[in-house]
Curated annotation (Swiss-Prot):
GO terms for cellular component: cytoplasm; nucleus; protein-containing complex. This is Protein LBH. Coiled coil: none annotated. Keywords: Cytoplasm, Developmental protein, Nucleus, Phosphoprotein, Transcription, Transcription regulation. Residues 18-104 form the LBH domain. The keyword Nucleus applies. Belongs to the LBH family. The lineage of its organism: Eukaryota, Metazoa, Chordata, Craniata, Vertebrata. Residues 86-105 are annotated as: Disordered. It is found in: Nucleus; Cytoplasm.
Length: 105
């Protein structure tokens, strides 16, 4: 069993008051957009004629060629994996191989 308690809130408008508000407000058709003072306008949505032009440009991918570089790393350039990491891996591999050889003997 549920008990209903009416909400007593000063901000709450009863339906009759809300109907009165809705009937007395200005219709949206009569509310016009006033031009800006400087007279400049801006477009929110893209122009449909620009859509075809953009689609034609997107059909072709840009041709970017990246060539691998050999030699020293320039200052500030990062490479992965770092050289220190490669040295540590080689040392670990050598240790593992030595351990396997010792077990086999």
């Amino acid at each position: 069993m549920s008990i209903y308690f009416p909400i007593h809130c000063p901000d709450y408008l009863r339906s009759a008051e809300m109907t009165e508000v809705m009937m007395n407000t200005q219709p949206m058709e009569e509310i016009g957009l006033s031009p800006r003072k400087d007279g400049l306008s801006y477009q929110i949505f893209p122009d449909p004629s620009d859509f075809d032009r953009c689609c034609k440009l997107k059909d072709r991918l840009p041709s970017i060629v990246v060539e691998p570089t050999e030699g020293e790393v320039e200052s500030g350039e990062l490479r992965w994996p770092p050289e220190e990491f490669l040295v540590q891996e080689d040392e670990q591999d050598n240790c593992e191989e030595t351990a396997k050889e010792n077990k086999e003997q």
